């Protein structure tokens, strides 16, 4: 679209009959206009950019990041002898194409999917008239309207829609698979599985492909993650400023949402904020409870921020201009010590089993209330691996080896069984060639550190 058209197209246009052949030309002009106004093309805004400049974090090379991700996917597909991958998880589609469309809605309404050929094109099946939403990335070779066969669209005729959908997928596999009819699929309902099998297409575990592809982050991905964490921590600062006696948990949680969206972030996965007696046991969702002076306020961000990266941090604050009680100080010290000790253990070459066996755990009167995991991977969301306490390790817990480029979250929850309050702390840590680097920087509450 020329520069003059970019700013004025469609603003004063009158409805009139099209001349023969004009519709497709206009459609392409509309698509180019819409692509240039896509939120990914417009960027994250001056609030976020100014904070990133102040933090000294350079912009990631998004083209290099996208190429790296596609190569990671195709390496896994080749290693596992697949002709391609059929992806429904919106986060996997984001990883493959760096495009988004109604991410939460399509997570529970499968109306958008993507086929990544091991040696061939990326074909994105998107919501109707959404071709412009992937043009910015340069990764998608073709956009087609998706055939959705969820009951919302198909009703009692779903079986017919499944056949139409499967025929298109099978044709792609035969056209680009070089005779290989095996594909990896991340999420698929049984009707689709059965129909693809009837057409001779063999299915394998697409989650294994994508989780292993996403495991090792490129330098540009780490830059994007650093920026997401800076944005998250800026929103946390606004949240802490708003923390006064009398504010509701819901109002406080809304500050984190507002700060994330204002900086070009995307959504928050959970509602994990609790105060006072609601901090023990953990996993209360935030509520209308009014926070009181002297309360612990504990939260887990679980935030999908700028660039789609997860900033997964936890903090526990003390509400009001007060000093902590001895019990609060002791609980906080136990959690902070556990995080500090377990972070020092993270380095390349350590096995998952070795890591958990060396890890510090809650004391006996808090152990029954322990958090479900000691560590977990993180990237575009919580990712593989998830590492439990040593005593929770079972014969179906996968072992592995820590590698440079992985990012782990280190978890601690300390609350006595039957106690009044509890402490949640979580840090995000990059594994480097020689050890680790803590990516999260938000300070702990100084009053609680001092005890």
What does each model-identified segment do?
Residues 1-451:
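Active-site neighborhoods and metal-handling regions in enzymes and metal-associated proteins
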């Amino acid at each position: 679209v020329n520069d003059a058209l970019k700013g004025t197209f469609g603003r004063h246009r009158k409805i009139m009959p099209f001349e023969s052949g004009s519709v497709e030309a206009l459609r392409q002009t509309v698509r180019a206009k819409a692509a240039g106004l896509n939120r990914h093309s417009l960027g994250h805004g001056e609030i976020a950019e100014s904070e990133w400049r102040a933090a000294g974090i350079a912009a990631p090379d998004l083209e290099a990041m996208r190429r790296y991700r596609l190569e990671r996917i195709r390496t896994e597909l080749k290693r596992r002898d697949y002709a391609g991958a059929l992806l429904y998880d919106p986060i996997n589609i984001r990883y493959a194409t760096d495009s988004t469309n109604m991410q939460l809605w399509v997570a529970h309404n499968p109306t958008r999917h993507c086929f990544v050929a091991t040696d061939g094109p990326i074909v994105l099946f998107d919501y109707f008239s959404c071709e412009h939403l992937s043009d910015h990335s340069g990764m998608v070779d073709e956009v087609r309207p998706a055939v959705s066969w969820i009951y919302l669209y198909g009703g009692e005729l779903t079986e017919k829609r499944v056949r139409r959908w499967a025929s298109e997928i099978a044709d792609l596999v035969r056209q680009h698979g070089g005779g290989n009819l095996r594909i990896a699929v991340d999420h698929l309902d049984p009707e689709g599985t059965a129909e693809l099998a009837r057409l001779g297409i063999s299915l394998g575990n697409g989650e294994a492909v994508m989780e292993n592809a996403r495991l090792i982050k490129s330098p540009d991905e780490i830059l994007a993650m650093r920026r997401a964490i800076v944005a998250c921590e800026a929103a946390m600062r606004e949240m802490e400023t708003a923390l006064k006696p009398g504010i509701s948990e819901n109002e406080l949680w809304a500050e984190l949402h507002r700060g994330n969206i204002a900086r070009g972030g995307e959504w928050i996965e959970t509602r994990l904020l609790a105060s006072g007696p609601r901090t023990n046991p953990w996993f209360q969702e935030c509520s209308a409870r009014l926070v009181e002076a002297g309360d612990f306020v504990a939260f887990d961000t679980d935030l999908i921020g700028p660039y789609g990266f997860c900033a997964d941090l936890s903090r526990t604050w003390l509400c009001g201009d007060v000093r902590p009680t001895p019990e609060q100080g002791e609980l906080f010290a136990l959690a902070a010590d556990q995080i500090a000790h377990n972070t020092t253990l993270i380095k390349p070459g350590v096995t998952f089993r070795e890591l958990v066996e060396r890890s510090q755990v809650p004391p006996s009167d808090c152990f029954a209330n322990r958090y479900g995991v000691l560590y977990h991977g993180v990237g575009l969301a919580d990712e593989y691996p998830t590492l439990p306490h040593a005593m929770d390790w079972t014969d179906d817990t996968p072992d592995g080896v820590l590698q440079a480029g992985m990012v782990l979250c280190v978890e601690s929850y300390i609350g006595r069984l039957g106690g009044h309050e509890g402490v949640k702390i979580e840090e995000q840590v990059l594994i480097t060639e020689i050890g680790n680097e803590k990516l999260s920087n938000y300070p702990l509450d100084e009053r609680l550190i001092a005890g």
